């Protein structure tokens, strides 16, 4: 019974973490299909550089469906990450832990689907 209780607690904690991060997960439009990004700082979104495909005509869509024009601020070929500036996005940044993860720690992938639904 203790294992079942511990797994239930872990499952609930993971669901709470997804719910807390969900508003900060956005859709990024830079190719034919949208990708996901995360609001890292106010009006700053981090996404996959491969998701962009171009430097102009970029858009970010919040969870409520509102779209905003985005500007490519830069990208890092070593990590494959791109940074977008999105004026007036008005979405709170994701809370980032000050503790570095260890190899073997659990991680959760959270994304916005093609229809802008949350997946984890």
List each model region and its residues.
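PAS-family sensory domains
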Residues: 16-17
């Amino acid at each position: 019974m203790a294992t079942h209780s511990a797994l239930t607690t872990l499952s609930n904690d993971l669901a709470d973490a997804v719910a807390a991060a969900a508003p900060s997960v956005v859709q990024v439009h830079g190719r034919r299909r949208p990708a996901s990004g995360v609001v890292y700082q106010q009006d700053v979104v981090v996404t996959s550089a491969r998701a962009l495909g171009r430097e102009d005509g970029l858009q970010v869509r919040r969870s409520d469906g509102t779209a905003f024009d985005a500007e490519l601020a830069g990208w890092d070929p070593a990590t494959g990450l791109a940074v977008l500036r999105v004026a007036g996005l008005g979405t709170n940044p994701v809370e980032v832990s000050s503790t570095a993860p260890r190899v073997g720690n659990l991680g959760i992938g959270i994304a916005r689907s093609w229809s802008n639904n949350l997946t984890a």
